[in-house]
Amino acid sequence: MASYGQTCPRPMCIPPSYADLGKAARDIFNKGFGFGLVKLDVKTKSCSGVEFSTSGSSNTDTGKVTGTLETKYKWCEYGLTFTEKWNTDNTLGTEIAIEDQICQGLKLTFDTTFSPNTGKKSGKIKSSYKRECVNLGCDVDFDFAGPAIHGSAVFGYEGWLAGYQMTFDSAKSKLTRNNFAVGYRTGDFQLHTNVNDGTEFGGSIYQKVCEDLDTSVNLAWTSGTNCTRFGIAAKYQLDPTASISAKVNNSSLIGVGYTQTLRPGVKLTLSALVDGKSINAGGHKLGLALELEA
């Protein structure tokens, strides 16, 4: 995402991947909130360059505790990244990625997962290619019934973005996903619209009002229904170490969050979700998250 007060050169810089279209608006709605969870994230790096990331959370409604552990090592000389993953469902994952070695802008990733409890295995080959004005992606999910192919393309010029995303299920010999998106992006404004499978329509607007205030509007509608989903969110930077976030939707769900950097590498987030239609009935949710990084 471009920074405030800057615009992309013409022709524009590398466009985002399809999954990242509209990301600036989504981040205002999602980051700084953690309703119904008590969460701890820890990140550290060894002297040899190995990165360790661990995360644990407890659901305040169900009491269920989940956790993940990830180690990552980058061999920069050869553009290689090795990643090992584990979670409390006892699923093991291995990922090997190589970037900018075969050709500039090309990244290849081989991703596997294995569950010792069930014996289930999965494999995926991911590829992405990004250059000025274009961002392409192709992933292949391997399955015993037949591989599924995911493809995407985003083209950009002078701030305008156009993207297409599809999934072809070889077992069924048909397209199972067919999505389009159009958007416009400048340094402090982003507009994104999308159509998913011809039935789901959505749009979002991101606006950096000033250096300390970011706002976002989100709209979604599904054909065949009278239900339109609408939301407004904002984030205000109180000072370099603290920020407050708020959002509300047409279901009268009101969310607020407060993030404070206690010291370098230590961040605390408090959040609350209030049902505006039944304030006295209860059912509201609180959240607490602590991030440690060294």
Curated annotation (Swiss-Prot):
Modification N6-succinyllysine occurs at? K31
Any idea which residues bear Phosphothreonine here? T118
What does its PTM field state?
Answer: Ubiquitinated by PRKN during mitophagy, leading to its degradation and enhancement of mitophagy. Deubiquitinated by USP30.
**What parts of the sequence cross the membrane?**
37-46, 50-58, 65-75, 80-87, 91-100, 106-115, 122-131, 134-141, 148-156, 161-169, 174-186, 189-196, 200-209, 213-222, 229-238, 242-249, 253-262, 265-274, 284-293
Q: Does the keyword Ion transport apply?
A: yes
Q: InterPro entries per the record?
A: Porin_dom_sf (IPR023614), Porin_Euk (IPR001925), Porin_Euk/Tom40 (IPR027246)
- Subcellular location as annotated: Mitochondrion outer membrane; Membrane
Residue numbers marked as site, Involved in ceramide and phosphatidylcholine binding? K85
* Family of this protein: Belongs to the eukaryotic mitochondrial porin family.
Q: How does it assemble?
A: Monomer, homodimer and higher order oligomers; formation of higher order structures is necessary for scramblase activity. Interacts with ARMC12 in a TBC1D21-dependent manner. Interacts with KLC3. Interacts with SPATA33. Interacts with PPP3CC in a SPATA33-dependent manner.
The molecule here is called Non-selective voltage-gated ion channel VDAC2
Q: Which organism is it from?
A: Sus scrofa (Pig)
Its ancestry begins with:
Eukaryota, Metazoa, Chordata, Craniata, Vertebrata
